[in-house]
Regions:
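Conserved ABC transporter NBD signature motif
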Residues: 76-88, 400-408, 415-416
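Conserved ABC ATPase "signature" region
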Residues: 112, 116, 123-141, 440, ...
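Conserved ABC ATPase signature
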Residues: 145-149, 473-477
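Catalytic Walker B motif of ABC-type/P-loop ATPase nucleotide-binding domains
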Residues: 170-173, 498-501
Length: 658
């Protein structure tokens, strides 16, 4: 739980300042002949959460470093609280992508160390540290080693360390990479509270579901800002409607409709795990055109739903107009797994793993077929990592039966290993080798024929956007580029079974589309793909999903089936005091049912939608909160996931982190 005091203490000790908290005017940053930031201008208001969205190399990190005062601009102005950013370094809390806690120090010791570096009195450090630990429900962990915290708790501790100096602005560069959905929502709830108390927050994120939680968003491209608006304004600016087509013939329908994309009737076609998304100007006309084309191609008719565009749609369409879209590079296929299509590639019955008296995985039954993309989801500690290690033969189960790539045993044999591709989140490449040396090593490990290696390596370099840079040290690559090389290394031998652990973590939106286009190609050619991801917007790309809670598989089906199976409605409220309304409703009911998305409030109810809307509106009005608009919106996978996890917690199946 996050306590609220509304002290408004951020930036204390400074003379009163009533203007925009951040003012950027005609800002430029050059590195030699490279223009990383090109004349950008924007303001950020006090108490605002402002998002910076853009592909790798757009200039986001350079902008952050200038705002934090750690790097000089080439020209232009960047003011923080009315003064040049270089003079206000003590008033900027900057959480970088690579922010490192000290794993061998306790939570309290990490806080004291950071406070001491900023010259804060030790007693004041302890007072502030205790206050923030209470605010973020972490006080009971103050003596725990930072290295023993979950990913979400580590991010909260990093946030506390950034807040101890009580900055006037907070700069967060991709703060939730690798954090599970429950922890991400808690982190963003914390940011919303801080903003309501008057702290100005600027966030860079590659994930559009997070951008939806910002008050305003700036779209960056090649060092420039193309658009600044609220998420709703950005969606409306497209002038397009999104059609969701549900059909079992995804690949065939995508290929047929993609040939017509851009002809005036269809602006974009994007494939997901159980549907296609089309962007169209005139939805009713487009529905008729799509139905006619599908019938002419001999394809089954599709169920069609209408919805608003997403922020990702805005970003992709804008990028395409600017010529920034990443086009899929044809993969040099040498193998075809079509003959295996539909057979079981990964199977488990009664899979159980115990460590001493602790059951990490209990009685899991799963079948993943060739040609299928299966997503395994779960919060930290749910058992999915242990399950994957067993399914790919790295860990012996305590009980249960398994089959992998047509074998019931001998999973570590060379024969089985050469049928499998594995991309680990924590280790995939050797940083002290060049890109070419890494690719040469993995091509040898996976047994890629010598005559095929040059072509496969050229493909990986092209797919990764690293043509001509094969001699570069791998450790010098930004995270997104390194992920692309690691993915290429895992598929160069064209495995029939592919394990991907957080494959697009930290990858920019355009590259993420290219990733999934390639994953779909592999599945279309018969490969079985098992994916883990913490980003539920991305889980929509899977054909089927399995959701784990407390070591058990509690839900399974297509994304649409999982959402449809969960009871309840999601109501979106536009009110005059969103944070106060959220705090009030969380006290009135279960906290997980309420979430802030910028200035909009989402409330999950199991009751009749109309009755719940009227009752909640009456409560808010009685509490002095004006309700301007209410509408029912569709449940997202995040809503469903968090609902399942929190209900399991209420039933005592899982507990709070200890």
């Amino acid at each position: 739980m996050i306590a609220v005091d509304n002290k408004g203490s951020y930036g204390e000790g400074l003379p009163p300042y009533s203007g925009a908290a951040i003012q950027v005017k005609n800002l430029w940053k050059k590195y030699g002949d490279t223009e990383a930031v090109r004349g950008i201008s924007f303001d950020v208001n006090k108490g605002e959460i402002f998002g910076l969205i853009g592909p790798d190399g757009a200039g986001k990190t350079s902008t952050f470093q200038i705002l934090a005062g750690v790097m000089k601009a080439s020209s232009g102005a960047a003011d923080v609280l009315g003064r040049p950013a270089r003079q206000m370094r003590s008033q900027s809390g900057y959480l970088t992508q690579g922010f490192t806690l000290y794993p061998d120090l306790s939570v309290a010791e990490n806080i004291r160390y950071v406070g001491a570096l900023r010259g804060i009195d030790p007693r004041e450090i302890d007072r502030r540290g205790q206050s923030y630990l209470e605010k973020f429900d972490m006080l009971r962990f103050r003596d725990r080693l930072a290295g023993r915290l979950s990913g979400g708790m580590k991010q909260k501790l990093a946030l506390v360390c950034a807040l101890v100096p009580e900055p006037g602005v907070l700069l967060l560069d991709e703060p939730t990479t690798g954090v599970d959905p429950v922890s991400r929502r808690e982190f963003w709830d914390a940011l919303a509270h801080l903003a309501a108390e008057g702290l100005t927050i600027v966030v860079a994120t590659p994930y559009f579901d997070e951008a939806e939680r910002c008050h305003r968003v700036a779209l960056m491209h090649a060092g420039t800002i193309r658009q600044i608006a609220t998420p709703e304004q950005l969606r409306n600016s497209l002038g397009l409607v999104r059609l969701e087509l549900f059909t079992p013939q995804l690949a065939e329908t995508e290929l047929m409709l993609s040939e017509h994309a851009g002809d005036g009737s269809i602006a974009d076609v994007q494939r997901f795990g159980d549907r296609l998304d089309l962007l169209v100007k005139r939805p009713e006309e487009a529905k008729l055109i799509v139905a006619e084309r599908m019938a002419a191609a001999g394809l089954d008719s599709a169920e069609v739903r209408t919805d608003m565009p997403t922020l990702e749609n805005v970003f992709v369409v804008t990028s395409r107009k600017l010529g920034e879209e990443i086009h899929a590079v044809p993969f040099p296929h040498r193998r075809d797994h079509h003959r295996l299509h539909g057979q079981v590639a990964i199977g488990a019955r009664g899979l159980t793993k115990e460590f001493g008296g602790f059951s990490a995985v209990r009685h899991v039954d799963v079948q993943i077929r060739y040609g299928e993309i299966y997503g395994l989801l779960g919060a930290n500690g749910a058992g999915k990592t242990t399950t994957i290690k067993m399914l790919c033969g790295l860990l012996e189960p305590s009980r249960g039966e398994m089959a992998l790539a047509g074998q019931a045993g001998g999973f570590r044999s060379r024969e089985v290993r050469q049928r499998i591709g594995y991309m680990s989140q924590k280790f995939s490449l050797y940083d002290d080798l060049t890109i070419a040396e890494n690719l040469d090593f993995f091509s040898s490990v996976y047994g890629v024929p010598h005559q095929d290696r040059p072509e496969k390596m050229r493909w990986i370099l092209s797919f990764s956007g690293l043509d001509g840079r094969q001699g570069q040290m791998t450790g010098s690559l930004p995270g997104g580029w390194k992920q692309r090389v690691a993915f290429g290394s895992a598929i160069m031998h064209e495995p029939s079974v592919l394990f991907l652990d957080e494959p697009t973590s930290g990858v920019d939106p355009l590259a993420r589309r290219a990733f999934w286009s390639m994953i779909n190609q592999l599945a279309d050619r018969g490969a079985a793909v098992l994916v883990t991801t913490h980003y539920l917007e991305e889980a929509e790309q899977c054909n089927r999903l399995g959701l784990m809670v407390a070591g058990e598989l509690v839900a399974e089906g297509s994304p649409a089936q999982i959402k449809a199976a969960q009871k309840g409605h999601v109501l979106e409220y536009v009110v005059d005091q969103p944070q106060r309304a959220a705090d009030f409703l969380r006290i009135e009911g279960e906290r997980w049912r309420v979430a802030l998305f910028g200035d909009r409030l989402h409330v999950v109810t199991d009751e009749d939608a109309l009755g719940a809307e009227q009752a909640t509106t009456a409560k808010l009005n009685a509490f002095g909160i004006r309700v301007f608009q209410v509408r029912e919106t569709r449940s997202s996978l995040e809503d469903v996931f968090i609902g399942i996890v929190e209900k399991a917690r209420l039933e005592g199946k899982i507990g709070a982190e200890e």
